[in-house]
Amino acid sequence: MPSSPGNRQHSLRSACERCRLHKLKCTILPQKRFEGPQEAPEQCTRCARAKAKCVFGRRAPPKHRASSSNDRSSVSKGINSTTPATRTMQPNATGFVSSHRIELPPSPASNQSSLKHSSVWDNLLDKTTPQEPRADFSSFSYPPVPFDLQSMCLDEVDMAASALPTTEPNFSSAQREHEFSAMSMSPGLGYDNLDELLALNEQPNISDASSPLLSETDPSHGMIRLSSLLKEIHETQHNLQERSFSCTTSRGLAGYPIGRVLHAAQTFSSMVTNLMRPRVVQTSHTDVQGFNPSLYSSSPESTELPSLHQEFVSSLEQMKTNALEQSRRLGEDDLDKYASPCSSTTSLQDTMLDMPIVMLVFCCFASLSKLYCSVFRFFEKSLHSQSCRAKDSTYVPPLQDTRTLQLGELSIENDTEFKVLKALRMLLDAFQAAEASLGLPSSLTVLNSNKSTISASAEPAVSDTGSLQHHLRHSLIKQCVTFDDRHLERTLTSLVTHVENLKQLLRVQNGLH
């Protein structure tokens, strides 16, 4: 006998609570299946295997059935008792069934004429006809969203109440799309159009000298690397001046960044060495059809790059002519003494040593000399402050680290003196390698030999280190640029003075004077 609706609503579930919780299929043995709506098996196969408690719950009454029963009870109370029941159930009556009947619009596949002449759509389009309360169809469309910072970042931006707009703009969807496309394609600040911004992004980054896009055969590669090195030297100089390193404690000396100075000197040496390497020049013979046999040749023609001295001497003949013309105009007849006979016809335009690269080499070498002077000045202050304190013989360096630069053996009994001597040796080796890459003699040795003839108030004497300034002077005269040709020599003289002072302090503090 089939069960009643009440029994069906509260019947047992077909799966136990444990299987429903784990979302597993609840299987029951054939001999333990449901025999009736009120009878449940003892255990399912999963609970029996896990030795867990198996509970079969009952179904809750459906919500739609409960709501329909409540509606029927409330409607039945509102029906007029004088209306006969037979008249209420007629299809043309105005009772419960006719008042709650919903006429759906035609399907999309129907004819458009039926949609136009439908009574439902006529009532919806006719605003003068009183209608029953219906759902607001305008709620299905997106509300007007103001396209401003207030609505987009209201929770993240702290905006004053006076700056908020008093009226809310109402943009249509087309206007919102136009404003969004205009904002996404607007050029950056400071540029008139998008082409300038794209052209700026295509320019190489000078700060990245190790970019894989740069080639060694590219003429601009040397300029970019030298510009990056010059920027690094000036930043190191600025950091050493801004940061206050204590010269009275060993900890302040240990934290002094001489590694940056060594890196700058070693990088300068490697860059100048790369500029002196032979340059490969390929001769291309292109026919009418555009065939280039040099691109498929495995043995391109190569020419050796002349040295820095030979390259400048090759262009002295033309420089001499320009200098003589300038001296006739200005009345300076002493420019002729700087010129020398030309022994070669190689042009600077055929090599990588063009005028901007020579200028950058000169600036890097001069800036590196100033950086060394500031480092040695700090070492002098450290040794002066150390001489005023009592010596602590708590650190004994190994035997291989006690050799000196020029004085033989030094019995260093202090940690500060050992660090200064070690740093001085490393820095001088790197600086002499930088001078050797330029083809110059050691300025420390040459200027030291002439130091007896140089006084503190007199002008520094001209030494062999003026060979670089000699060539640079001719190059700069060609470009109509004037500069102090003895500025670098004065810097090197100051550098030698600092080195001699450091050596003298080491002699005095170790009893070797």
UniProtKB/Swiss-Prot annotation:
<keyword id="KW-0479">Metal-binding</keyword>
<feature type="region of interest" description="Disordered">
    <location>
        <begin position="58"/>
        <end position="92"/>
    </location>
</feature>
<keyword id="KW-0539">Nucleus</keyword>
<comment type="function">
    <text>Transcription factor that regulates the expression of the gene cluster that mediates the biosynthesis of varicidin A, an antifungal natural product containing a cis-octahydrodecalin core.</text>
</comment>
<keyword id="KW-0862">Zinc</keyword>
<feature type="compositionally biased region" description="Low complexity">
    <location>
        <begin position="67"/>
        <end position="76"/>
    </location>
</feature>
<feature type="compositionally biased region" description="Polar residues">
    <location>
        <begin position="77"/>
        <end position="92"/>
    </location>
</feature>
<dbReference type="InterPro" id="IPR036864">
    <property type="entry name" value="Zn2-C6_fun-type_DNA-bd_sf"/>
</dbReference>
<keyword id="KW-0238">DNA-binding</keyword>
<dbReference type="GO" id="GO:0003677">
    <property type="term" value="F:DNA binding"/>
</dbReference>
<dbReference type="GO" id="GO:0000981">
    <property type="term" value="F:DNA-binding transcription factor activity, RNA polymerase II-specific"/>
</dbReference>
<dbReference type="GO" id="GO:0008270">
    <property type="term" value="F:zinc ion binding"/>
</dbReference>
<keyword id="KW-0805">Transcription regulation</keyword>
<dbReference type="InterPro" id="IPR001138">
    <property type="entry name" value="Zn2Cys6_DnaBD"/>
</dbReference>
<dbReference type="GO" id="GO:0005634">
    <property type="term" value="C:nucleus"/>
</dbReference>
<protein>
    <recommendedName>
        <fullName>Varicidin biosynthesis cluster-specific transcription factor</fullName>
    </recommendedName>
</protein>
<keyword id="KW-0804">Transcription</keyword>
<feature type="DNA-binding region" description="Zn(2)-C6 fungal-type">
    <location>
        <begin position="16"/>
        <end position="54"/>
    </location>
</feature>
<feature type="region of interest" description="Disordered">
    <location>
        <begin position="97"/>
        <end position="116"/>
    </location>
</feature>
